[in-house]
Amino acid sequence: MQNKGELTMNETKKLKGRDLITIGIFSALYFILNLAAMITGFVPVLWLLLPGVAGVLTGIPFMLMESKVQKPGAILIMGLITAVLYFVTGQFTVLLLITFVVACILSEAYRAITKYENHFIHMAISFILFCYGMLGSPLAIWVYKDSFLTQIQQNGMSAEYVESLSGLISVPMLIALCISPIVGGAIGALISKGLFRKHFRKAGIV
């Protein structure tokens, strides 16, 4: 039988209405900044490194959400909201869905393992894992290649763009793609820490 202290602790870990509103607001900001990262995709090499570019831009909303809602399920809900927004706007593919789900689960699991501690390194690693969710977008060019290139040309991309993109497909670029969430996510986390140093210090994040 649980004592009063355990019941109180379990109660504080539950998501409340205010938490859900906070998650919703930062999820919307994350989505908008992620779209901004996708716009940079008009430069072929930046599109192939999209997870890293997105990591640089989206560190602020994710890290702030982590600092404000240190409870189980927060990251999964953020991922779900983002996925729904992508689906509604027609940006979601099966491959992106797979990588996004896996990344959300890993990020949430890491936060659970570290007991949702207010520790910058733990929060940054969780964010980096979350950044791997966007891997599925550029990864499609390696998985589907010819059919993917044909599709984007039919969707209005110029022949020059498609040719430039095709010329970048290589094993070294694939390795760079897989590393990009680590680099971009780390930069994004450091930017958020620099901009909101006072908030992080007040929340006990070191």
Which residues does each predicted region cover?
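Membrane-water interface at transmembrane helix exits
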Residues: 33-38, 66, 70, 86, ...
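Membrane-helix interface segments
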Residues: 72-76, 93, 118-121
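Membrane-embedded alpha-helical hairpins and interfacial helices in multi-pass inner-membrane proteins
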Residues: 47, 124-197
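Interfacial aromatic-anchored transmembrane helix boundaries in multi-pass membrane proteins
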Residues: 39-47, 82-109
